[in-house]
Every structure is written in C-alpha cells, then in structure tokens.
Curated annotation (Swiss-Prot):
Keywords on record: DNA-binding, Nucleus
One BP term from GO: brain development
Cellular localization per UniProt: Nucleus
SMART domains, per the entry: HMG
Protein name: SRY-related protein AMA1
Source lineage: Eukaryota, Metazoa, Chordata, Craniata, Vertebrata
Native species: Alligator mississippiensis (American alligator)
C-alpha cells in the first residue's frame, strides 16, 4: 500500500491496513499469528535476558 501510494501519510495507511485486518477470518490471520509466535520464540532463545525498555 505504501509503495502504491508513496505520498500517503503513515497514519492513513495504518488505518486502512487495520480495517483490512479486521475483515480477515481467523483462518486467514493464522499464518501471521503463527509466524509471530515463531519469531517471538526465536528472539527469546537468542536474547534470553532481553527486557523491553522504552
């Protein structure tokens, strides 16, 4: 979406993507959730003492 509309503000892109995400079924969302879990586990393994500090 950002590549198709390079002048579009990031907040507008985020709102549109959020709206599209809400329209997806749980089955369509599952691959993304599974990948997030895999990456989270990999990060925990590589950086066991990591603490989020904003």
């Amino acid at each position: 979406m950002a590549q198709e509309n390079p002048k579009m503000h990031n907040s507008v892109i985020s709102k549109r993507l959020g709206a599209e995400w809400k329209l997806l079924s749980e089955a369509e969302k599952r691959p993304f959730s599974d990948e997030a879990k895999r990456l989270r586990a990999m990060h925990m393994k590589e950086y066991p003492d990591y603490k989020y500090r904003p």
